[in-house]
Amino acid sequence: MPEPYAGISVGTTPFEIVYSENKMRLLHYLPTVKKQHPVPVFIVYAFVNRYYIMDLQPDKSVVRKLLDEGFDTYIVDWGYPSGDDRHLTLNDYVNGYLNSAIDRIMELSGIDKVTLIGVCHGGVLSLIYSVLHPEKVKNLVVLNTPVNFDTDKSLLNIWSKSMDVDRLVDYYGIVPGELMNIGYFFVDPLRNIIDLYSGVYDRVDCEPDDIKCRRQDGESVRTFLRMMKWGSDNPGQAGEAYRQFIKDCYQKNLLIKNEMEIDGQMINLKDITMPLLNIMAKYDNFIPNESSIPLNDAVSSADKTMAIFPTGHIGIFVGYESQKDVCPMITEWLKPRSF
């Protein structure tokens, strides 16, 4: 972690580590209210960056919104892969780590199904898991999750299609997080800068004697530093899993074609029948809506909902729109489906 951010606190909602395997940890957040919905919620974050964007600070926390509405909430922390993890595959993550974590959640809760909330590429893992283990998934919520990668609406898609991923993985083994971060920044540098600094610019007009405004200004700066910390915290990527994801999804578009294979099993999105909530950000510069919208027609779920919010890729988790509309929609959608 870069030294300037070492003292910046993030992810402060109390939790306990209830399972770990290799670098992966399963975090169980402590409840904030007595009345709990029976079905536990398991947030599956992406490999890129860190899970605590879902709990950046108390007033910008998807996790706290879930807890305050009575949801028993867990999240996966993928940790920081090292050289001995270079050969991990998507099968290791889905049928290994995720499956073991869900078994532990079911053991602790006494409930035989969980609600999955998949975030970005963690949503792809959640889709794959729901196909392979439908008996363990009560509800499926995905945020900013791509399924149709055949689009030129994002530079990320264009670059990934032309990437020599074999050369990259064969050379590095573990794809460096710093390299990933540079690539993601240059997908849309102007929007990324605006998103990062907007919270600070909102408070630069304080009068010297306006104590309340100056306190808010200080909190805006702290929010900015937390975002900087998160944006600089980039784990490396297990080479073989990264190779498979880039080739199968971005370059061959196998997921939406129902031709992706995990451990000898075909991933057919039509096998998804549980209730589905598909959420996306209108101004997402990484995962264009055109990549996420086809999911609802690709699954067999009779109970399925789609929502698009006027925010960006990160704003959907920490922005004003997230706290005002996105989180309430998730919790209200889940309540009648969590018993």
Where are these regions (language model features)?
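Short beta-strand/loop motif that positions the catalytic acidic residue
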Residues: 272, 278-280, 284
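Acidic catalytic loop of the alpha/beta-hydrolase fold
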Residues: 253, 283-287
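Short, surface-exposed "cap/lid" segments of acyl-processing enzymes
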Residues: 4, 11-13, 17-82
